[in-house]
């Protein structure tokens, strides 16, 4: 009986350690957030102090250079590109 209890406790401990060792896949994971900051998607803010545009898209700014947004490439308007 004592051996069964020890084996049971060992199994519970290993399961608990396995659950704790899983990588954090939550949306608040710092690694995912850092990766997301690598480039700005379509119609997202870009430019000075912000991320560059993904897929070499142009970063278009207003006249005051204050509101910069990633825009589509010319070829993307015709269904080309990625």
From Swiss-Prot:
Gene Ontology MF, one: ion channel inhibitor activity
Keyword flag Flavoprotein: no
Phylogenetic placement of the source organism: Eukaryota, Metazoa, Ecdysozoa, Arthropoda, Chelicerata
One Pfam assignment: Toxin_9
GO CC, any one term: extracellular region
Organism, as annotated: Phoneutria nigriventer
Record keywords: Calcium channel impairing toxin, Disulfide bond, Ion channel impairing toxin, Knottin, Neurotoxin, Secreted, Signal, Toxin, Voltage-gated calcium channel impairing toxin
InterPro entries given in the database record: Spidertoxin
Function description: Antagonist of L-type calcium channels (Cav1/CACNA1). Induces immediate clockwise gyration and flaccid paralysis after 6 hours at dose levels of 5 ug per mouse.
Disulfide linkage: 39-54, 46-59, 53-70, 61-68
Domain comment, as recorded: The presence of a 'disulfide through disulfide knot' structurally defines this protein as a knottin.
Family label: Belongs to the neurotoxin 02 (plectoxin) family.
Protein name: Omega-ctenitoxin-Pn1a
Annotated propeptide span(s): 22-37, 72-82
Signal peptide: 1-21
Principal location class: secreted
Subcellular location: Secreted
